[in-house]
């Protein structure tokens, strides 16, 4: 479950326990801003320790939405590398082992050029992590938090000249990154189910899901599929748009979602839901719907008001009470 942090880190950790989440994803900063914190938020140690007590693992971080590793603008790409490197370094303080990012758009140049840029950016970001920095100035990560997270590239729905719509594009990124010295274990991939649907993959059909997984295994190896974003979709298949919906209530529906949740090749992978209304109690509603599908149950229809809730929040990176007023928020150096 993607945890909203708008009510504070401590409250978010307790919410994970209340709903029985087994894995969580968070933002370490505002995903819609370039500026990054220079010190960890208050409550971070308590947040991390509570998740350990609850045996919530893995913890994943979703990087800034502003990142575009594929674009031709050198300055913008360098800023993207700075922000992604900052988010990766800060992730260690949250106990995160995965940092998920959108690869971005080639902005009308070419897919091959975009792939080359992404691979080089990946190598640059991972090269900065070898020193074990915390991501915050003058703050050192202790031994228990010094492991470097895996960078995870998410598939795209296909709009706006995006890179990563096809499995072959991710495979080529991995190939170029390897040639630049990036070890296989440092770079992995995420399947966002709603994105795949938007890109034209029949995620409502078990046979098409199996075909997608077989192709991924041929091109990259299923060992490199590290994370699944389990989202239904309100968009049309192949629309190249990304519109998340409640579990089993969208166009993908119960059959496809159940097949993913019970697939033997996926049973050990973390599933994260980024569904609507997380701040309004629908985090538990959607988690319970996923559990019901695993149990083979038919889902009850959702009430009309369920479809009027806010989409998943992207701005609530940290609550005000987690921010030390003495600490300025600045752009990465």
Model-derived features with residue positions:
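N-terminal pre-domain/capping segments
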Residues: 1-63, 67, 71-86, 137, ...
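Active-site beta-loop-alpha junctions enriched in small/polar residues
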Residues: 2-6, 29-31, 64-66, 104-106, ...
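Aromatic/hydrophobic pocket-lining residues that form the small-molecule binding cavity
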Residues: 9, 44, 80, 84, ...
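Conserved, mostly hydrophobic/aromatic
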Residues: 16, 62, 80, 91, ...
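Short, well-ordered coil/turn segments that N-cap beta-strands
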Residues: 20-22, 53-59, 94-97, 131, ...
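Alpha-helix-loop-beta-strand connector modules within alpha/beta enzyme cores
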Residues: 41-61, 118-130, 173-179, 252-263
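Active-site acidic/histidine proton-transfer and metal-coordination neighborhood
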Residues: 69-188
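Histidine-acidic metal/acid-base catalytic patches
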Residues: 135-139, 171-333
């Amino acid at each position: 479950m993607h945890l909203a942090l708008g009510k504070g880190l401590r409250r978010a950790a307790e919410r994970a326990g209340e709903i029985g989440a087994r894995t969580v994803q968070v933002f370490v900063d505002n995903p819609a801003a370039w500026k990054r914190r220079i010190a960890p938020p208050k409550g971070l140690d308590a947040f991390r320790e509570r998740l350990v007590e609850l045996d919530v693992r893995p913890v994943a971080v979703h990087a800034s939405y502003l990142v575009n590793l594929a674009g031709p603008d050198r300055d913008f790409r360098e800023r993207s590398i700075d922000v992604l490197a900052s988010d990766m370094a800060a992730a260690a303080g949250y106990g995160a082992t995965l940092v998920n990012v959108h690869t971005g758009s080639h902005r009308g140049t070419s897919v091959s050029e975009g792939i080359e840029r992404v691979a080089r950016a990946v190598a640059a970001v991972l090269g900065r992590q070898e020193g074990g920095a915390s991501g915050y100035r003058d703050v050192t990560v202790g031994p228990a938090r010094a492991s470097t997270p895996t960078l995870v590239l998410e598939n795209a729905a296909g709009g706006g000249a995006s890179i990563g719509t096809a499995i072959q594009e991710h495979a080529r990124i991995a190939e170029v990154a390897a040639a630049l010295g990036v070890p296989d274990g440092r770079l992995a991939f995420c399947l966002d189910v709603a994105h795949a649907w938007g890109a034209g993959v029949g995620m409502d059909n078990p046979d098409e899901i199996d075909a997608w997984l077989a192709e991924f295994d041929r091109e990259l190896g299923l060992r490199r599929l590290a994370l699944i974003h389990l989202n239904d979709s309100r968009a049309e298949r192949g629309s190249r748009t990304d519109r998340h919906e409640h579990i089993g209530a969208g166009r993908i529906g119960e059959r496809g979602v159940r097949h993913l949740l019970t697939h033997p090749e996926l049973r050990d992978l973390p599933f994260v839901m980024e569904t609507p209304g997380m701040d309004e109690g629908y985090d538990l509603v959607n988690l319970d719907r996923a559990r019901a599908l695993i149990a083979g149950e038919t889902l009850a229809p959702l009430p009309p008001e369920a479809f009027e809730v806010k989409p998943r929040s992207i701005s609530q990176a940290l609550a005000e009470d987690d921010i030390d007023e003495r600490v300025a928020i600045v752009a990465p150096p």
